[in-house]
């Protein structure tokens, strides 16, 4: 059955900043553990708990705050939780044989200001939470850029990623949060 929706943007952004962000972050975490395919992550209960917590406690909180006036069952707490659980199950489907290298490729794009990971971090910060797991993954992505570009620090890597973005307060707050391991987030 086809259900028409008058506004698809919240659904598209939820897929991008929810599913796509966590897929990338889960891939980075799995790669760090020596895994080569996403279904291997599904066999690691601790890693899947990490992914569900990142999705539900960080990404979903930010998305619910962003779309708090949008009326649809998926945008409720239960709806988002069900969405997250379903998405995680699909991410680690063994029949896909999804290579982690494919999932984690192009960190420069995936850590872009308006892209999946940083966009999710921004939504979470705007909801007043510190998205520690997402930030940890962003740092891992920056580490990959450092290696690929022979940079000495994450600041240089982040400068490369965000070179086209003019500086403003929100950007500086997010930059500081990602680069400083001891700082809590503040609502921006």
Locate the predicted segments by residue.
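Substrate/ligand-engaging "lid" and interaction regions
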Residues: 1-188
């Amino acid at each position: 059955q086809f259900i028409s929706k008058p506004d698809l943007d919240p659904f598209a952004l939820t897929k991008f900043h929810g599913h796509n962000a966590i897929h990338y972050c889960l891939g980075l975490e799995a790669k760090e553990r020596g895994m080569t395919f996403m279904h291997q992550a599904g066999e690691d209960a601790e890693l899947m708990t990490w992914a569900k917590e990142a999705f539900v406690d960080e990404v979903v909180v930010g998305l619910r705050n962003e779309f708090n006036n949008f009326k649809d069952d998926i945008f409720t707490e239960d709806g988002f939780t069900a969405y997250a659980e379903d998405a995680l199950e699909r991410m680690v489907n063994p029949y896909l044989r999804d290579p982690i290298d494919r999932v984690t490729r192009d960190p420069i794009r995936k850590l872009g200001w308006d892209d999946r990971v940083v966009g999710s971090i921004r939504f979470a910060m705007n909801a007043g939470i510190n998205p520690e797991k997402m930030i940890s993954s962003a740092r891992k992505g920056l580490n990959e850029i450092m290696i690929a570009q022979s940079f000495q620090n994450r600041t240089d890597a982040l400068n490369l990623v965000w070179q086209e973005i003019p500086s403003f307060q929100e950007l500086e707050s997010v930059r500081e949060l990602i680069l400083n391991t001891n700082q809590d987030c503040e609502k921006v």
